Amino acid sequence: MGDLTILNIISFLLIFFIGLPHGSFDGAVAALVGFNKRFQFIQFLFYYIILFSLVILFWLYFPIFALSIFIIMTIIHFGLCDWTNFRINKYKYSVSFTYGMTIIFGIIFFNENQSFLIFEYLTNDKIYLIQKYFFIPYFLTILSIVYFIYLSIFEKKLRKGVIEILFLLIIFYLFDPLLSFAIYFCFFHTYKHLKHLVKNIYSNLTNKKFVIYSTFVFTVVSWFGGLGIIFYLVCLLYTSPSPRDNR
């Protein structure tokens, strides 16, 4: 992947210390969906850790399939979050698809070589088996953006989305994939996600102390986990040859 630059390190720090902790509200979300008793919350944590461990194992044995599922889930998550931010009851799938595809494949399109070097480490080089098919999501992304612009003619609330998408595409064009993702993840997605999440949590949960306590614990854990991942990546980049070198 080459040397780890200052911008790469800044990107990792932004993701782990600003973006990643927005998942720290998972404990509060669990309470919202029914895990609101002490024993139930312990059950949630148990399931959470088991699922996380299974995902890691699955990724190790089936990296291409796991990465594909991760990309699809990321597209859905980002897209739905951005659709919710518009506060409209229509065009759910069109808006979600456009935003999700634009974020993921916009970054990859403008930084394909660097993006595939990252995927190379995540999949042990096997990603190149499907690289030639990436023209399909690129084409679908362009079509979705054109359709989104068309919808904005009839729905005024979407017009700010056109400006936002164009602004994000400029960012993706100017910066490398890690920094591009960090900018979107931290300053666009996290802000929208937290705004929606905090509003729902504080209007539906009476135990505010639980929200604060669980969020604090999850945040600290995510920060330590983030530091561990950064340390691991630094060691990996400087001690291991690129998978491409083994071809």
Name each model feature, range by range.
Residues 59-106:
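Membrane-interface helix-loop-helix junctions at boundaries between adjacent transmembrane segments
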Residues 23-32, 78-87, 146-156, 194-198:
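C-terminal ends of transmembrane helices
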